[in-house]
């Protein structure tokens, strides 16, 4: 390793925040930092000092020091460049270079330090990239949360309005001298009076409890007042109304059954002591009249070793990609070995891969505007008619080796015009009246089911049906890059391994 640790300390050598990039005890790092001020010679303008075992590269920051602890054979020029990047990171997270401010943002600084250095070597990143990586901002997550909060507020407002209506109906019945309606189904006898709003809420929450037959109600003559039976017809009507507006309502039992079913149908991943995760994400933008505006695909092989006896291994990579993908290995991986023999191994074969942590050993990137590279083409043809628009949408799988699962093609609809009239359709559809979208759902698209169409009619203009968005997931990667064999460095004996492949969408739009 080259870089052992990075720390912010006081002029007395007290550690405020420290990140070790090799295995090192707390006593050891505190001892190194405590010895640091005693080694400095204030009469000389040096930015580093050395001992018999390590080198300190440092930069004063008002009353503090930014210190890098490296091995003595490290490149001092690279260390100084890395030190400058560390020093620029700290003001990004701390308003003042003071001990209290550094301590308050210690975790933010540690996360940023990890983006700069991996396995003791500096990553090729700049300040803007570090900020982006540490924020992990997701626009889709913000939109989802905002929509969810809006739905919850609307549902609560509707519940309050319905409760007021029921309370008013009960008061009207009492004024007319008739018995107020009771509530049954919560015990051996009916419960009358009380807060109507509370009873409605309790009815929805307690749908998973076993129902007991209500006691027969005494006849009280004909009444025009609103009646609530043991089965909660008003509640059922209200829930049906929410469902018709696109809200998903399910009882606790149903939710549990769905969760259990998901667990049963989820394919188990048999993880060996050596496990590879191959993940690809695609970002694609097409024009509505044809033509690929941009397609970018990022892939990575993540290695996870759970048994330290398999730490010194090599991965045999089979690259059958013919699309011109750009490959890049981790800085600690022997690039010459990979180029010559398609083997992924550490530069120092005596070293071991980290245990119980995901390590990215190989990544690739593909960027193109070639239409033949589009994995799934979508054609949307809206044509104006006398009553609005007739929309025809077609899909076609261009990569026959792919199998796309859980495909959802989302088409925006004009607001305030009602539900679309569906003609012919391959698969299923969902109409979301709240979001004004039509979701075309296809469980599988593969070589046996590579094309399909959807036709519907709705009032609107052709521009109302764009952008069309697509989402899917696949267990086969787009770029045909696989790990075919894993062997140990000593003896070249084979090692059992498992692989998990995922190809998913980051953004897929037809504008």
UniProtKB/Swiss-Prot annotation:
Belongs to the adaptor complexes medium subunit family. Delta-COP subfamily. This is Coatomer subunit delta. The gene is Arcn1. The modification Phosphoserine is found at residues 223, 244, 493. Oligomeric complex that consists of at least the alpha, beta, beta', gamma, delta, epsilon and zeta subunits. It comes from Rattus norvegicus (Rat). It is a peripheral membrane protein. Signal peptide: none annotated. It is found in: Cytoplasm; Golgi apparatus membrane; Cytoplasmic vesicle, COPI-coated vesicle membrane. GO terms for cellular component: COPI vesicle coat; COPI-coated vesicle; endoplasmic reticulum; Golgi apparatus; Golgi membrane. The coatomer is a cytosolic protein complex that binds to dilysine motifs and reversibly associates with Golgi non-clathrin-coated vesicles, which further mediate biosynthetic protein transport from the ER, via the Golgi up to the trans Golgi network. Coatomer complex is required for budding from Golgi membranes, and is essential for the retrograde Golgi-to-ER transport of dilysine-tagged proteins. Its main location: cytoplasm. Keywords: Acetylation, Cytoplasm, Cytoplasmic vesicle, ER-Golgi transport, Golgi apparatus, Membrane, Phosphoprotein, Protein transport, Transport. Residues 168-188 are annotated as: Disordered. The modification N6-acetyllysine is found at residues 233, 241, 309, 351. GO terms for biological process: adult locomotory behavior; cerebellar Purkinje cell layer maturation; endoplasmic reticulum to Golgi vesicle-mediated transport; establishment of localization in cell; Golgi localization; Golgi vesicle transport; pigmentation; protein transport. Transmembrane segments: none annotated. PROSITE patterns: MHD. It comes from the Eukaryota. Residues 168-177 have a biased composition (Basic and acidic residues). Residues 271-511 form the MHD domain.
